[in-house]
Amino acid sequence: MDEHEEAVIFGICLVDFHHKRGPEIEYWYGLPEGTQSAELWPNLPFQALPDGSHSFEETFTYFTLLYDERRQRSPPNGATDLSDDSINDNTTLFAISCSRQIKSDELVTKDKDVTRSTVQKAIVVISRQPIFGQIKDKLSIVTNAFFLQHDFGDRKIIQSLYENLKSIYTPASLVRNAENRLYIGLCLRKILHDFKRNALVLLKAIMLEKKIIVYGNDVEALCNLQFGLISLIPDLMSNLQDSGSPQLFQDISKLNVVDSFKSSNRESVLRFLGFPLPIFEKGGLFSPYTPLQQMNDIRSERTLFFMIGSSNTLLAEQKEELCHIFVNTDNSTVDILDKTLNPVLQLSSHDKKWIESISGIVSDTWNENDDETPKNSQFEGSEDFIRWQFEDYLTGLLSSVKLSDYLDLHKENDQALKTIPEDMLNSNPVHLFNLNWVQSWKETQNFLIFNSRTDDRLFDLFPPKHIYNGADTLSLLQQRFLATFHNLKRSSSNSSSNKNGHQSEEDIKDQESIESKKSVSQISVNPGKNTDKPAANLWNSWKEYFNKPKNTANEDVTESTEDLKNRSKTSNAIQKAMMGLGLHYKPDAETDQQSEEVGNSEDNEDDDTDEDSEDDDDDGGDDDDSEDDDDDDDGEGDENGDDGEGDENGDDGEGDENGDKEDSQDFSNGFTDVTNINTDHDKENEQNFEGNAENFNEDETVADKDIEGGPESNKNSDSKTDIYENDRNVEDSSKTRNTVKKSNEEGGANDAAIGNCVQDEEKL
């Protein structure tokens, strides 16, 4: 008996589906001596031949069995009705079955009970450890060979299987690299490929000790999912002895705090970290495949939480009243039925990015021919890679929770807080795992056991962190918000200082830089002129003017500077009319002090030839520089500065209604060669800008030169009126007359005034 208790392989049996009695155990082999086989696991046949297994050529099923070591039998009333004196005698065993079917006509010897066209049987191997992956292939081969005999009376092959497995899997052999042996056949890549981020949701739900049902037609897939999720918690697969009944648990009062470990011993390190987390302790049940015959165990008041699997649709129809979370492996969905769990199981941003990166790697390396092996057999995306990633995630989680609890416990103890590094104090990364989930986890039984057997300063040796090292989106947004706030604050401060007549150092530097660039520009454009007088104010005034948008509602251009608003309406009206003819007007009263402005001409068709500066003046004379104030802007050129042509409102050479009257009254004042624009600012910086062709670049418009160089005083202007000779050819003169006539037709009210101007030109 002692020999069998130590044996890893507990026994093997053959299950038959009887056409009248249903599933039943047909044959046992290898049971410990004295075991009452007739009273062993009445539900085992239903677990070995699951619902829907007849739809598959071959079906594997994983399930748990409860066994009383002292009495050598299974509990008589199920897993939830153990007597108090037998609780400590019970343990959990693990079984894997392989079922197949054959046509009854193919059998060499047909039993008289065979009344249907097919015969279905299953071979079941029971062990003390969940070594399903290691024995699955052998079990499949033996089962197939057993059916190929076409004679179920010959059971020697089943006996050979037991002897072979017993000799291979001994307690000593499992001790060596025991953890990795249990992971064989559990395809984590398949889980992440199908469920992606929900794989992490399910793992965190298991740690919260919730009721979870896994449903699907493919029994092997739903069993693989459950064991795969459990295997993500380090060393848990080796410690499932209490998972078969909600009445089994370990006494935490006997646990001692693990305060040291040996770094060369992995098991020692895991014990120091608190692994494995005892998930299925008192009140918990783990049954990878659960037939309807075990519904009493599920509904029992002693069953507080569970993870079970089923392929029966009746159980799926009752999911609302049976579980908190329902998982469907057929379509890879996770349905959280208890809506109060939504905020708890919501993944944090770090959780999402990490699990999505892992599932993305799996998808990128997916191999259609082999679920367990990535493309090119690389490590990234492999089973070990995934398992280590989850181990690092859980290690960081446990350490972060320990740090958070320590800070809460010693928040008023400065001496204790000084022993913690400042960066660790400031980070406190527990919030990266979703604080709602952390708070719920602290209320579970497995956390209480973990907390009672681990050191309070676990974070000193294992850094508290989230495995995802990417930038936090929320932190980036906060940084951007703060930067924007500081910029707005500085802008507000600068505006306020400017209103008070003060300038910041940055503004002073910027202004000095602009003036220095302006001086260089003036020297390069006008090397022979005097550039000592600054024209910054005039530049600012004209810069605003050129940047002003067109006011289509009032059919004028809005001007912002007071200098432009104070100009004489009469002189401007006359100037516009004269410039339409290619002539320039100069009032008597302003002979000594005058400012010359020439507008920008963008439409000059004669730029290819070498024209003198007088031609440039003629072309640009009726541009933007001849604008009137808000009420008298109709005489200006369009915004593009076309030569002598107005915009769509007919502004070329025309004044408004008041301007036209003044045009007809003031022709006697004479003609001049420049356009007169008088502003208060111009009087302070009075300069004459009379043209010498060498002072201007032919590639620049006249308005640009005014902006950079500013007007200069005309010291040589002695005569009251000067008339430029019109060097344009006959075609240009004709063009000018046509322009004037067009303006007369559009304006209407200015016919008389413009007519007089034409006559004066002909006389000249």
Curated annotation (Swiss-Prot):
Residues 519-529, 666-678 have a biased composition (Polar residues). It is found in: Cytoplasm. Residues 195-360 form the cDENN domain. InterPro entries: ABL9/DENND6_dom, DENND11/AVL9_GEFs, Tripartite_DENN. Residues 502-518, 715-735 have a biased composition (Basic and acidic residues). Coiled coil: none annotated. Residues 490-535, 550-572, 587-764 are annotated as: Disordered. PROSITE patterns: DENN. One of its GO terms (biological process) is post-Golgi vesicle-mediated transport. Pfam families: Avl9. Residues 10-173 form the uDENN domain. The modification Phosphoserine is found at S519, S524. Belongs to the AVL9 family. This is Late secretory pathway protein AVL9.
